[in-house]
């Protein structure tokens, strides 16, 4: 039962790390990356459809995204969605594909993005700490019910803390890598 609490906690902490990685992937770092368009949706036959499901997105150059829609009639809609988005990018439409040039980031914008990265990282750390708290509460319930001894409670509590420390270390590493990517000129 207590091993179950540990494995569930570990799984939840890994999910928090993965969510952070996905979230940071959508932050523009001055380099072309197909995940920039992950949150972008287009109204396609009455349904909000993600662009990455209706077009091929490739990175031909370091600062260029090439969007090739499977259905050429939707090209204008994708262009409008990009212009309306908060990406700050202007697509170049040549009738069959869209080209997105990724401009260099200004120093001020880099600092804003680093703040955003730190905020996302802090939210992930809070999620991990909440998972730790839930695990400790579950272990205390097991001890109260007589399923585990007080010594087991202490031992499993230390294991939960080790998982938490490891997860926070991973989050710090992910954050540091993203900050370095953003600050790279």
From Swiss-Prot:
The Swiss-Prot or TrEMBL record describes its family as follows: Belongs to the RRF family.
HAMAP family noted in UniProt: RRF (MF_00040)
Per the record, the GO terms for biological process are: translational termination
What Gene Ontology molecular-function terms does this entry list?
Answer: ribosomal large subunit binding
Record's keyword annotation contains Protein biosynthesis: yes
> What cellular component terms from Gene Ontology apply here?
cytoplasm
Primary gene name: frr
Task: Spell out the Gene3D superfamilies in the cross-references.
Answer: 3.30.1360.40, Ribosome-recycling factor
Q: Where in the cell is it found?
A: Cytoplasm
Q: Which organism is it from?
A: Listeria innocua serovar 6a (strain ATCC BAA-680 / CLIP 11262)
Q: Extract the InterPro entries matched here.
A: Ribosome_recyc_fac, Ribosome_recyc_fac_dom, RRF_sf
Q: Which protein is depicted?
A: Ribosome-recycling factor
This molecule's function is given as: Responsible for the release of ribosomes from messenger RNA at the termination of protein biosynthesis. May increase the efficiency of translation by recycling ribosomes from one round of translation to another.
Tell me which UniProt keywords the record has, alphabetically: Cytoplasm, Protein biosynthesis
């Amino acid at each position: 039962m207590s091993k179950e609490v540990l494995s569930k906690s570990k799984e939840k902490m890994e999910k928090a790390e993965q969510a952070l990685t996905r979230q940071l992937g959508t932050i523009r770092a001055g380099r072309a990356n197909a995940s920039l368009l992950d949150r972008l949706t287009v109204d396609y036959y009455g349904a909000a459809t993600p662009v990455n499901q209706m077009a091929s997105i490739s990175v031909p150059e370091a600062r260029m995204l090439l969007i090739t829609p499977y259905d050429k009639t939707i090209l204008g809609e994708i262009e409008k969605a990009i212009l309306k988005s908060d990406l700050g990018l202007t697509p170049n439409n040549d009738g069959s594909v869209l080209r997105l040039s990724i401009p260099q980031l200004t120093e001020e914008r880099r600092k804003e993005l680093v703040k955003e990265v730190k905020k996302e990282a802090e939210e992930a750390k809070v999620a991990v700490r909440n998972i730790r708290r839930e695990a400790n509460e579950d272990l205390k319930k097991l001890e109260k019910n007589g399923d585990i001894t007080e010594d087991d409670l202490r031992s499993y509590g230390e294991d939960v803390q080790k998982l938490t420390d490891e997860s926070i270390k991973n989050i710090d590493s992910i954050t540091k890598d993203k900050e370095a990517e953003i600050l790279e000129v």
